[in-house]
Swiss-Prot record:
It comes from Homo sapiens. One of its GO terms (cellular component) is extracellular region. Keywords: Adaptive immunity, Cell membrane, Disulfide bond, Glycoprotein, Immunity, Immunoglobulin, Immunoglobulin domain, Membrane, Secreted, Signal. Glycans are attached at N73. Disulfide bonds join C41-C115. This is Probable non-functional immunoglobulin heavy variable 3-16. The lineage of its organism: Eukaryota, Metazoa, Chordata, Craniata, Vertebrata. Residues 70-77 are annotated as: Complementarity-determining-2. One of its GO terms (molecular function) is antigen binding. SMART domains: IGv (SM00406).
Length: 117
């Protein structure tokens, strides 16, 4: 019975607490093949500096594809093969921001890009 009462108490406390994770992307636009574009993502509602972060994309008629990831402190980065040496992921923990620099864009890079925790 004590366990059940603990849950009721916890639910009562959390009912008034509102915590919303927000990831807001910006910087998109149409760019000719060969051009460059920098995407930004402003994060809030969680401890950004403790979280590994990623970019994913959804091209028309295709599934969601992971593009790139960066460790919590920026020391490790990873890329899908198709964007290696063209895209650069980076972060600024002091600004709670994630970035994706897209260089030498190709037609197949046209997609909706998402910032992913």
């Amino acid at each position: 019975m004590e366990f059940g009462l603990s849950w009721v108490f916890l639910a009562g406390i959390l009912k008034g607490v509102q915590c919303e994770v927000q990831l807001v992307e910006s910087g998109g636009g149409l760019v000719q093949p060969g051009g460059s574009l920098r995407l930004s993502c402003a994060a809030s509602g969680f401890t950004f500096s403790n979280s590994d972060m990623n970019w994913a994309r959804k091209a028309p008629g295709k599934g969601l594809e992971w593009v790139s990831g960066v460790s919590w402190n920026g020391s490790r980065t990873h890329y899908v093969d198709s964007v290696k040496r063209r895209f650069i992921i980076s972060r600024d923990n002091s600004r709670n921001s994630l970035y994706l620099q897209k260089n030498r864009r190709r037609a197949e890079d046209m997609a909706v890009y998402y910032c992913v925790r």
